[in-house]
Amino acid sequence: MRQATLYRYRLPVDAGVALRNQRLKSRDGLLVRLHEDGREGWGEIAPLPEFSHETLPEAQEAACRLLAQWQVGAAPAESPLPSVAFGLSCAQAELSGTLPQAANYRSATLCNGDPDALFQVLQSIPGEKVAKVKVGLYEAVRDGMIVNLLLEALPDLHLRLDANRSWTRAKADGFAKYVNPDWRDRILFLEEPCKTRDESRAFARDTGIAIAWDESVRDADFRVEAEPGVAAIIIKPTLTGSLQRCRQLVTQAHQAGLSAVISSSIESSLGLSQLARMAAWLTPGTPPGLDTLMLMQAQLLRAWPACTLPLWGEDTLDVVWQG
């Protein structure tokens, strides 16, 4: 007998969690739980405001419809809404035992704040130092100076940078001007520096700074292929789609000689733990980009190793559908 429950959650986040044009006051999403023959599987459906095309109410409506089909024994078609496709596929994979338990919790450290604070955080990273720094929020020249300062101060540091398509080509060049050419190879990649792919390609060609595709991966016309100056693709499953779709992209990237990085869309600790399992399974040896739990004020159902945030249980969830 099949049983399904859809819950809604609301997690408080730290003040000042900025998206593109707004600040998050809470992280709202859905959890799905499937039961069948004594087995259980969970998944998270959490569209990210300003990044997901679907809203949370739209995702909830679609999930309820698909769960009703599943509950009576059907095999529902994959949802066209990425967050719904991802969450349901995770729940089904846990139910069937096809999502391996092994997880890669060693994420690239997400760095925010002033350079002195960043230096202290980065200096304390044990072993290989891989960190992610958001750029494009301030002046490009300032970003270039800070990146240069960090690379100069920490010779064993490698950086992933993310500009979210925020720069014109002129601003991107202003950033590069302040990064010592001798240290640019320690920038593993800069995600989408410019507003268009062609400008980003030209930037990589002219500066020697490798780039990665992030937003482009979700464009309808995107194809995974080897290109000069392109080092990686970033896969954010909540924004991309089902486990099967993500696995397909990883395979295509590896066949093209590119790295694939599993990355967070500010999911709860439950969703993040599933992303860590995906990373260990699909991209072993590549640190995922999952260091977003520090933005939360609580964990949800499943604890992240060594995290000291309080763990919220099922009593904090609201049931929105059951069958």
Curated annotation (Swiss-Prot):
* Keywords, in A-Z order: Lyase, Magnesium, Menaquinone biosynthesis, Metal-binding
In terms of superkingdom, the source organism counts as Bacteria
Q: Which GO terms describe its molecular function?
A: magnesium ion binding; O-succinylbenzoate synthase activity
Q: What InterPro entries does the database record attribute to this sequence?
A: Enolase-like_C_sf, Enolase-like_N, Enolase_C-like, Mandelate_racemase_C, OSB_synthase_MenC1, OSBS_N
Any Pfam family from its record, for instance, is MR_MLE_C
Q: Which residues bind Mg(2+)?
A: D162, E191, D214
Give me the reactions it catalyses. Answer: (1R,6R)-6-hydroxy-2-succinyl-cyclohexa-2,4-diene-1-carboxylate = 2-succinylbenzoate + H2O
Q: Which residues form the active site?
A: K134 (proton donor), K236 (proton acceptor)
Q: Does the keyword Magnesium apply?
A: yes
Q: In which pathway does it act?
A: Quinol/quinone metabolism; 1,4-dihydroxy-2-naphthoate biosynthesis; 1,4-dihydroxy-2-naphthoate from chorismate: step 4/7; Quinol/quinone metabolism; menaquinone biosynthesis
What does this protein need as cofactor?
Answer: a divalent metal cation
One GO term under biological process is: menaquinone biosynthetic process
Provide the E.C. number(s) assigned to this enzyme: 4.2.1.113
Family stated for the protein in its record = Belongs to the mandelate racemase/muconate lactonizing enzyme family. MenC type 1 subfamily.
Q: Which NCBIfam families match?
A: menC_gam_Gplu, PRK05105.1
Relate the protein's function as given in its record.
Answer: Converts 2-succinyl-6-hydroxy-2,4-cyclohexadiene-1-carboxylate (SHCHC) to 2-succinylbenzoate (OSB).
- Protein name (Swiss-Prot/TrEMBL): o-succinylbenzoate synthase
Q: Which organism is it from?
A: Edwardsiella ictaluri (strain 93-146)
